[in-house]
Amino acid sequence: MSEGVLVLDADGRVRLVNQAFERLFTITGDIRGRTLMEALRLHQMQELVNTTLLKGQIEHFELELAALEGTRSLQVNSAVVLGGDGRQQGLILVCHDQTRLKQLENTRREFVANVSHELRTPLSMIKGYVETLLDGAKDKPEVATKFLQTIEKHADRLTYLIEDLLTISRLESGQLVMNLQRADLHGIAEHVVTDLGDRAVAKQVKLLNQVPVGLAAQADGERLRQVLFNLVDNAIKYGRTDGNVVIGGRKAEQPEVELWVRDDGPGIPPEAQPRVFERFYRVDKARSRDDGGTGLGLAIVKHIVQSHGGEVWVESEPGQGATFHFTLKPA
């Protein structure tokens, strides 16, 4: 069983303990015959036992434990053990590790808070400009045109955000099935270069497709194109003006194909690199929003690559650009 169980006798000494309890509390020796304080040295647990014995009813509380991997959250329940004569014969403690559940709940809260913020910002901007137009700005053609362009920009941002939210929701729920077949990687990269050509020209960035001709992988072509689009789009946004963005690829020594997108921008700080694939995480929050980013692009990249059975990672040194790598199964 996954729950940790410990039984105390009428004298308050450990009579029985299972392996799950020992794992939860990192117990290495035999604690049978010891008191709870001798075994665990946790005042909260002793207080729970005292309260349970005093009230004679089921008690429970949450216990936070320091562990090597971080804080562990336990739900602890206690109940008196009664004999045939109705007298107290001891007490039982049942502990359930709810760390993962807590983490998921925190992730859900953060996600809802982020979505609310991301939706509220463009909606507030649109509402503000519409009110200004209604107050008389519509009668000034130059001002009205500028305001309408801004409204369109924020409406587009809302559209991109909703599309990305739907995509990541389908990916995480497994509803988005990958149509795996032989994919021409050079050709897909060339499509992405064409799709983002105008943005690159506007930023004076040179796009280079260095994926070897003939390199192929087992992949969903449409989703792979989305992965490269997101990576190259980011590289254009955050790379330096008049710089280069390179799409490369090779057949790795292991039975896999590796692709990468490299820019020569300012790079990503070491402390930010482990988080860049998180939903809504932005290294430069203000700049990302100004550039119309949703904060979901790299999270989508990660989920699509993992749905292909591949891995994705980033390498970067401050001032030397960033390279995003990912692997696929060969065709």
Name each model feature, range by range.
Residues 134-141:
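Short acidic helix/loop segment immediately C-terminal to the autophosphorylated histidine
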Residues 153-158:
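Short alpha-helical segment of the dimerization/phosphotransfer core of two-component systems
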Residues 173-178, 216-219:
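Conserved micro-motifs of the catalytic ATP-binding
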Residues 32-100:
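PAS-family sensory/regulatory modules and their coupling/dimerization elements
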Residues 185, 267-278:
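Short helix N-cap motif at coil->helix boundaries in the Bergerat
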Residues 309-310:
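Conserved glycine-rich
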Residues 179-184, 201, 206-215, 252:
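Conserved catalytic submotifs in the C-terminal HATPase_c
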